């Protein structure tokens, strides 16, 4: 059974599954039954933490498609899993509902219906919108916790100042920010704050859009329709070449530990911080099981120190960006399913 970690009061497997790829983001999506089977297999091998969002699916299907898929896959084990989903709040919705609380609750009720549940374990504000008070969102989340509709709440792509203000209003269970061997900005302030205040840290894109697996090369051709990797700066040919020394470091440790590059990249962050729970995403069952297997890869303190030193000696070229959810478009395509 996979080791467990805590996101404040939520006990989750050390590695979760990011479910977005079953509905969009990585090109052609799998057949429904394949996706359902993949999530169930992940549960069978010890994963109890599954991450979705109301917006996932809006390009190929419709917003909410991914939540429906996750709900269907895990309905028979609902009490044994921790479901995380996210909302994006627009100012016009707040105005229409008369309050931030009513707007947040309306999103939550819709998500619960799609997930087939009467509560959500972890409810994130997907992105901060400067036109909507995050302080009021934090207060609304507290009311929803008191009503038993959510067990905890979180923020995504948040800075430490905003996090601290929100946490003072309603204690935050988890922060979901980008973090990997190529994206380490959160190590300066956000992760230390989370450690100090008993807040879980849930990295998205922990394998850097697949780059750290070593399977993305200058010859890789991404799919034409709905493949966000086409727009990731780190996956431009010149940056793939320039970041090769990082893959060389990973390859050395993969041989040492009889593991894959992706597993080493996940084991590294698990060793580094006790509150980190990565949620690598994939639409491929083999990759999902490989990623979950990283929980069994244990680095000694000496091995970790050597790996950290080798990484620190490398220069990272390019950045990952937030191509799925750029602020100027994110949430604007929301249409209710007919």
Residue ranges and their predicted role:
Residues 1-81, 334-338:
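N-terminal binding-site loop/beta-alpha segment at the start of enzyme catalytic domains
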Residues 2, 225-256, 271, 275, ...:
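Terminal-tail/helix-coil boundary detector
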Residues 10-15, 46-48, 77-81, 117-121, ...:
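Short, well-ordered coil/turn segments that N-cap beta-strands
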Residues 17, 35, 42, 50, ...:
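Conserved, mostly hydrophobic/aromatic
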Residues 18, 53, 84-86, 123-126, ...:
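A cross-family glycoside hydrolase active-site/sugar-binding cleft signature
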Residues 21-26, 56-58, 90-96, 287-290:
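A short acidic, helix-capping loop that chelates divalent metal ions and anchors anionic groups
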Residues 90-185, 189, 199:
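Glycine/proline-rich, positively charged
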Residues 186-225, 260:
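Aromatic-lined glycan-binding groove of carbohydrate-active enzymes
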């Amino acid at each position: 059974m996979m080791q467990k970690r805590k996101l404040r009061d939520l006990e989750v497997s050390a590695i979760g599954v990011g479910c977005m790829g079953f509905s969009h983001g990585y090109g052609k999506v799998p057949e429904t039954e394949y996706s359902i089977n993949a999530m169930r297999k992940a549960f069978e091998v010890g994963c109890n933490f599954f991450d979705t969002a109301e917006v996932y699916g809006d390009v190929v299907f419709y917003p909410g498609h991914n939540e429906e898929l996750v709900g269907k896959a895990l309905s028979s084990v609902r009490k044994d899993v921790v479901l995380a989903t996210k909302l994006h709040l627009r100012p016009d919705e707040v105005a229409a509902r008369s309050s931030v609380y009513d707007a947040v609750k309306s999103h939550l009720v819709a998500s619960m219906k799609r997930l087939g549940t009467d509560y959500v374990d972890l409810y994130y504000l997907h992105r901060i919108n400067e036109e909507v008070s995050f302080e009021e969102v934090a207060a609304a989340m507290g009311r929803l916790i008191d009503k038993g509709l959510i067990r905890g709440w979180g923020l995504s792509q948040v800075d430490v100042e905003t996090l601290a203000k929100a946490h003072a209003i309603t204690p935050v269970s988890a922060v979901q920010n980008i973090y990997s061997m190529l994206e380490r900005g959160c190590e300066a302030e956000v992760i230390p704050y989370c450690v100090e205040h008993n807040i879980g840290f849930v990295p998205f894109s922990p394998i850097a859009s697949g780059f750290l697996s070593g399977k993305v090369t200058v010859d890789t051709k991404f799919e034409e329709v709905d493949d966000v990797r086409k727009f990731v700066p780190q996956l431009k040919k010149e940056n793939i070449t320039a970041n090769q020394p990082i893959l060389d470091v990973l390859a050395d440790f993969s041989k040492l530990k009889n593991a894959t590059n992706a597993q080493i990249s996940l084991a590294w962050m698990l060793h580094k911080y006790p509150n980190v729970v990565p949620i690598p995403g994939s639409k491929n069952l083999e990759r999902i099981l490989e990623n979950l297997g990283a929980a069994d890869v244990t680095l000694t303190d000496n091995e970790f120190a050597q790996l950290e030193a080798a990484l620190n000696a490398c220069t990272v070229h390019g950045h990952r960006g937030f191509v799925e959810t750029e602020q100027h478009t994110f949430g604007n395509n929301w249409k209710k399913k007919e």
